[in-house]
Amino acid sequence: MASTSTSANGGSTNASIVSQPVVFTTQTQYPLPYQKYMIPTTWRRYQLSQLVNKALSLVKPVPFDFLIKGEIIRGSLAEWCSEHGVGEEETLEIEYIESVMPPQKMSEIPHEDWVSSVSCQLPRYFLTASYDGNLRAFDLSKNLTASIPAHPAPITSLCLVSSSLLDDNSQQIVIASASHDLTARLTQVALNPMASTNESKAMASLHLHTAPVSSISANAAGTHVLTASWDGLIGYWDATVPSTDEVPEPALNERDRSKKRRRVEEGEVKAKRKAPLSVFKSHTARVSKVLFASGAGETAYSCGFDSTVRRWDTETGVCSHTITASEKPFLDMALTPDGNSALATSTDRSMTLYDLRSSTTILTSASNTYMHPSTPSCVATSATNSHQVVTGAYDGVVRIWDLRSPKSAMATFKPWSGSGQKVLSVDWKRGIVGVGGERGLEMWKVGEEQKV
């Protein structure tokens, strides 16, 4: 319809321009008073963002993105209305959100072998696990502060169990790792920013699984860990170190006994062999991911190649709820900060959002599906924005998503100079996304700049 329309500079024009009645809503710290605007249908994100900034009289401009019915506007209002069959008389409710600033590469740290897992959870450090069996810690200046030969086979997963500050200003941390060697391990590391080398100690090896261990995670208190394996089992463990072995060593031949005697004579400290507190049995194929829900750790979630997402009571070891998808072998999973939803990536090139509060056990509990051009191998959620997640894929692309807009990613970037090398792991903390893969480790600044 022809009407007086708002201009991008805050004035108005009487020219005969097709306009659409619009009201704006937001959940940000920049709300507008409720008011109906007549917006030219030729406008796109940039003009809408200018309007909101001028209406709010913001001293420092804040870029916004805009959503209609949960979908981010990528073109003009006219294009959106035409695609969705919306008439000129219909009032549009448009939600605005703060834009994701273009990701900026911070640094790159090559590794000799694939980086299968990366953690940004420890302030001022990045932790990596590699197919060469080593755990590594790097500071913000890219200095290698610790290198630990934790496993004799590729490491698949790591997590930070606990961290404490010592009197000499160093940090004592415990890292849990999982490996193709059928074990998981707890390793203690002292990180001193003033020391050229840092000490590590093998605390315990976790013995249960009969196939590669694919995932390990710790609860928030650092008192318990979970392991998941290709054997379909999930192990539930406490993080204490026993005084003696809880699992006997396998029988050794004469050659192995000689090697063991040499290690003892050289003073090598042997990790204690731990047994699980309980074993969770319900998956019918490989378990690819297991993690604790937020809180005290009474609840855990897992996903696997049997196309299921399962909820567990850690005290009883009972599977209390199962979401079954159709032919979706799951590779990775993350929980939203509120704990109400799970995001699971699959070999069918999708990431699916599941409502964990739903009582249904079938695919109808899926809220949205986010398609990728290549298999998304990993996913991590933002700690500060409940709507934003990051995925890494086998096409070598990292994608930043807003969960309210499933059609396309908010931003993308290609690590390792766009070489197309597979991304195997991502983590997101304090505005930094760590990316691990075939070419090593890269760190990218994503979102609001925060103190690292």
Curated annotation (Swiss-Prot):
GO molecular function, one term: ribonucleoprotein complex binding
SUPFAM superfamilies: WD40 repeat-like
UniProt keyword terms in alphabetical order: Nucleus, Repeat, Ribosome biogenesis, rRNA processing, WD repeat
Ranges annotated as spanning the membrane: none
Residues covered by region (Ubiquitin-like (UBL) domain): 17-98
Subcellular location per the Swiss-Prot or TrEMBL entry: Nucleus, Nucleolus; Nucleus, Nucleoplasm
Keyword set includes Nucleus: yes
Gene3D superfamilies referenced in this protein's UniProt entry, alphabetically: YVTN repeat-like/Quinoprotein amine dehydrogenase
Annotated Gene Ontology cellular component terms: nucleolus; nucleoplasm; preribosome, large subunit precursor
WD repeat start-end pairs: 110-148, 150-195, 208-247, 282-322, 325-364, 371-411, 418-452
Biased composition (Basic and acidic residues): 252-269
Keyword Cytoplasm appears in the UniProt entry: no
Region Disordered: start-end pairs: 245-269
GO process annotations (BP): maturation of 5.8S rRNA from tricistronic rRNA transcript (SSU-rRNA, 5.8S rRNA, LSU-rRNA); maturation of LSU-rRNA from tricistronic rRNA transcript (SSU-rRNA, 5.8S rRNA, LSU-rRNA)
Family statement: Belongs to the WD repeat WDR12/YTM1 family.
Subunit-level organization: Component of the NOP7 complex, composed of ERB1, NOP7 and YTM1. The complex is held together by ERB1, which interacts with NOP7 via its N-terminal domain and with YTM1 via a high-affinity interaction between the seven-bladed beta-propeller domains of the 2 proteins. The NOP7 complex associates with the 66S pre-ribosome. Interacts (via UBL domain) with MDN1 (via VWFA/MIDAS domain).
Function: Component of the NOP7 complex, which is required for maturation of the 25S and 5.8S ribosomal RNAs and formation of the 60S ribosome.
Name the UniProt record assigns to this protein: Ribosome biogenesis protein YTM1
Organism: Laccaria bicolor (strain S238N-H82 / ATCC MYA-4686)
Gene: YTM1
